[in-house]
Amino acid sequence: EQQELIDATKDKFTQETYKDEENGVSLDYNLFIPADYDASFSYPLIMFIPDSSAAGKSSEEVLSQYYGADIWASDGEQAKHASFVFCPVFSETVVDDDFNTSNQIDTAVKVLNQLMKDYNIDTSRVYTTGQSMGCMTSLYLNSLYPDLFAASLFVSGQWDINILKPLENKKL
């Protein structure tokens, strides 16, 4: 069933590259645009961040190995609520168990901001999720940008509780 989902959705994503002129980092990413995208209507966006085993893999491999992005682009989910799906493809581990981070995370946020400018994305309905490294990255992003995401789904991750202090009274 998982492989069927991947096979049915992976080709619905486009593979893009963003060049961060500020820090020189290039970031590949997968982007799903709702099938009947209408620029006069605003859409939610879900950012899915895979675990560290995806680091260094191609955009296509990330979609073929993991279904965290694919599930949101499935016909069933899109029928319920058409949405954009953004899946950054990191060339390295972007956060580790000692809470060290990569500047690729900053570039992913720049891509997200650019997508919100390029498309009619409802900035009050931007979500993040991911497992393991993806969860940790989502936690980190919530600590840096506590008002960026409407909600987050954290799966199998951890983060330094002191860094998360700004989120203490926020409903995630």
Predicted regions, residues:
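A domain-start/cap signature at the N-terminus of enzymes
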Residues: E1-P44, T129-M133, L141, L153, ...
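Extracellular/periplasmic catalytic domains that process cell-envelope and extracellular macromolecules
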Residues: E22-G24, D38-S42, E77-H81, I121, ...
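Gly/Ser-rich "nucleophile elbow"/oxyanion-hole loop immediately N-terminal to the catalytic nucleophile
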Residues: D36-Y37, F41, V94-S132
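Conserved hydrolase catalytic core segment
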Residues: Y140-A150
